[in-house]
Amino acid sequence: MGKKGKGIKPVVDNRRARYEYHIKENLEAGLVLVGTEVKSLRMGKANLRDAYAVVKDGEIWVNNFHISPYDKGNQFNHDPLRPKKLLLHRREINRLYALQREKGLTLIPLKIYFKEGRAKMDLAVAVGKKLYDKREDIASRDAWRDMERSLKERNRA
């Protein structure tokens, strides 16, 4: 038997979250998964697009986190949209509960990765962006691209 791989292996990234939300802070949480979920996750068959986390009964749960059923699974295959429990310390859960109760703050998963063989989730405390914020981001990105393009052309000449 070989050793478990060291380091971080990214699996799924919620790229839309940085466009839709202002990220206030990040933290790492462990995931409670069943066997077929882990196998599907290792194959990269998951979607974080509409996922969000809630604090319920002193525990943190992720809802709308879709993990596709494992191809070689049988009748014991998992439900793709079942709520998944996150593993955090009690004081972190209490702090997140207080933050979640504030108006406008939400818990959004940013990415899923494997760290030393264990599934981890990068969770963010975020505030939803307004439409004008999104437009500003697009405009600044376009301006940055134009500047980079002009510098590149200037350096070629």
Curated annotation (Swiss-Prot):
Main location: cytoplasm
GO biological process terms, semicolon-separated: trans-translation
Keywords of this entry: Cytoplasm, RNA-binding
Pfam families the record matches: SmpB (PF01668)
Entry keyword annotation includes RNA-binding: yes
Source organism, top-level taxon: Bacteria
GO CC annotations, alphabetized: cytosol
Family classification: Belongs to the SmpB family.
Physiological role: Required for rescue of stalled ribosomes mediated by trans-translation. Binds to transfer-messenger RNA (tmRNA), required for stable association of tmRNA with ribosomes. tmRNA and SmpB together mimic tRNA shape, replacing the anticodon stem-loop with SmpB. tmRNA is encoded by the ssrA gene; the 2 termini fold to resemble tRNA(Ala) and it encodes a 'tag peptide', a short internal open reading frame. During trans-translation Ala-aminoacylated tmRNA acts like a tRNA, entering the A-site of stalled ribosomes, displacing the stalled mRNA.
HAMAP family in alphabetical order: SmpB
NCBIfam families: PRK05422.1 (NF003843), smpB (TIGR00086)
Descriptive protein name: SsrA-binding protein
Organism for this UniProt entry: Syntrophomonas wolfei subsp. wolfei (strain DSM 2245B / Goettingen)
Encoding gene, per UniProt annotation: smpB
